[in-house]
Swiss-Prot record:
One of its GO terms (cellular component) is extracellular region. Probable neurotoxin with unknown target. Possibly targets ion channels. Keywords: Amidation, Disulfide bond, Ion channel impairing toxin, Neurotoxin, Secreted, Signal, Toxin. The lineage of its organism: Eukaryota, Metazoa, Spiralia, Lophotrochozoa, Mollusca. The modification Valine amide is found at residue 65. Residues 1-20 form the signal peptide. It comes from Californiconus californicus. Belongs to the conotoxin T superfamily. Transmembrane segments: none annotated. This is Conotoxin Cal5.2. GO terms for molecular function: ion channel regulator activity; toxin activity. Residues 21-51 form a propeptide. It comes from the Eukaryota. Expressed by the venom duct. The cysteine framework is V (CC-CC).
Length: 66
């Protein structure tokens, strides 16, 4: 079994929101929307990981995939 550190969980939760903020602040809105859409398709495995880390933060048994 693998266990995440709480810090890793927190970082995983913070990355998407900060990345989106940077994209929106640097690009115009329509460009930001299309970019975020394309990027989101590429990072969907990361999104799964984030959901797992949220679960890990709640259940305290990090990254164990049954």
């Amino acid at each position: 079994m693998m266990y995440c550190l709480p810090v890793v969980c927190i970082l995983l939760l913070l990355i998407p929101s900060s990345a989106t903020f940077v994209v929106e602040s640097r690009l115009e809105k329509d460009q930001a929307q299309s970019f975020t859409g394309d990027a989101w398709k590429r990072v969907s495995p990361i999104h799964e990981m984030i959901q797992r880390s949220q679960c890990c933060a709640v259940k305290k048994n990090c990254c164990h995939v049954g």
